[in-house]
Structure formats: structure tokens, C-alpha cells
Amino acid sequence: VVASVAMLITCLDMPFIASIPVFGIGMIGIAFQVSFFQAVILAKVRKPGASIISSLVLGLFHVVFAPQMILFAFIGGLVGEVLGLLIFRSYKSYLSIGFTSCFLVPVITLCFVALYFMLMSPAKAMDHLQLTNAGWIIPTCVTLGVVALSIAGATCGTLLMRTLYKKGVLHESL
């Protein structure tokens, strides 16, 4: 519940960021927070499906800004969940938690937002992705920024939970 409320509070800057017409700029605004809270949730609830459920909660908060975001959040959580469980087989290690947590926002940004615009209106997509005006520099920089912030958020969330478990504030529920 606390993580859900915190995700809602951290998304309050989205109306201001959404008015900037740059591909993925909204994802830069939420990449750190979403990955951080995803790592906190996965460290507390170490069960398969936790990433998908928390992604759906995230999508419910973002459906106000764009109705397709709940679908993108679900797919991003599913991709992270499947890759994390295929590689690590469980969420027992903090590396698996961090790995799974950093996939949600980049998958949404890199793949599905661009694909959505390409399918809905190819001409509008070229303008939205700034492929006609600024070349490939702006989408590439934004994408790298989103990936870096997602990794930083997942790392911070994982380190916070590890510290809380070591200090005895939280008890591991494996």
C-alpha cells in the first residue's frame, strides 16, 4: 500500500513533463521512481507474479495520462518477470530482484510506445519520435537516460531493502 501511494505521489510531475513534445520524456520523469518501487515490492514479496501485479497497479495510475499505458505496463512487467525467472529461477537473490526491476520502464519506452505510434499513425509517429527534425540523437539520448535511471532506481531499491533486512527492521519472507 505504501509503495502504491508513493508511486502515485511521484507521478504528480507527469502533467508538466507530458507537455514537452519529446519522445520518452515522460518516462525519464518516472524511470527512477518506478524501478525503485518495483525493487522494493519484489524484495518484500519474492513470489512469481509480483512483478506483473505491481506493474498493473502502476498501469492503473498511468491510465489517466494515456489509456494504453495499462497494457504497456502489463507487457513490461511480463517481460521483466519472464526474463528474471528464466535467468535466475526465483527472487531469492538481490541480483535477480534488481535485474527484473530495471526492465519495466525501458521495455515500455523502447518498444511499445514507439510501436504504438507507428501502428496508429506512421506520419505522426515520425514527427513524434523526432526522426524528421533532429535525426536519431534525441530519441537515443532519451532512451539511454531512461535505461540509466531505471538501473539506478532498481539498484537503490535493492540496496535499501538489503540494508533494512540486515539491520533487522524488516524480516525476510522467503
Placement of each model-derived feature along the sequence:
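Hydrophobic alpha-helical transmembrane segments
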Residues: 1, 28-32, 48-56, 70-75, ...
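Hydrophobic transmembrane alpha-helices
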Residues: 1-49
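Aromatic-anchored segments of alpha-helical transmembrane domains
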Residues: 3-12, 57-66, 102-112
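Interfacial aromatic-anchored transmembrane helix boundaries in multi-pass membrane proteins
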Residues: 14-23, 57-84
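Membrane-embedded alpha-helical hairpins and interfacial helices in multi-pass inner-membrane proteins
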Residues: 20, 70, 95-173
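Hydrophobic/aromatic residues in alpha-helical transmembrane segments
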Residues: 37-38, 75, 156
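Membrane-interface helix-boundary motifs at transmembrane edges
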Residues: 42, 86-95
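Transmembrane helix-loop junction
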Residues: 43-44, 81, 85, 162
